[in-house]
Amino acid sequence: MIEIMSDTLMDYIRGLSTRRKTFGAGQDLFNQGDDVESLYLVEVGVVHLVRHQANGNIAVLQRASSGVILAEASVFSSVYHCDGVAVSDVSATSVPVQLIRRALRSNSDFAEGWASYLSNQLQQTRKRAEIASLKTVAARLESWLAWNDVGLPSKGEWKALADDIGVSPEALYRELSKRRISFVRNGT
């Protein structure tokens, strides 16, 4: 049901779009403090929402890939609260924020789909916060596996998994190697 609502929501958003934009890897879609004029639906690629910390670190607030609305929390803000940075080459549907606001006021189906989408994003954020609070790679991986009943992704997706749980790819590979050795020793 949520997936159907999400598809309908994304189609509706695409219908409100005034254009599709492309961004090269490393390019900013917007910066903290910029006026919020548009929301973006990521079609291809990955965008990170980041905040630069006083100590020089970068906090990744959101990892938006295909089918994710970028900076949805800014729909009722006058300025962006973070930077949107393309991690890879990105194609995104751009929608004037005024059209989103109008649709929320005038279309109850859209408003319900939007609320459902935000609820899902909040659950995902809580999951990421829980995983990030764990100290070891093993604990983070276990938590990710518990949240995602699909099991370990294919080898080609391990770098994205490492990014998702906030560890280096090398640390994840070492943990997976330990588990593989453990599986062989235990006969599983």
Task: Enumerate the language-model features and the residues they cover.
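Cyclic nucleotide-binding regulatory module and flanking cytosolic helices
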Residues: 1-25, 69-70, 74-75
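A short hydrophobic beta-strand segment most commonly corresponding to one strand
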Residues: 90-99
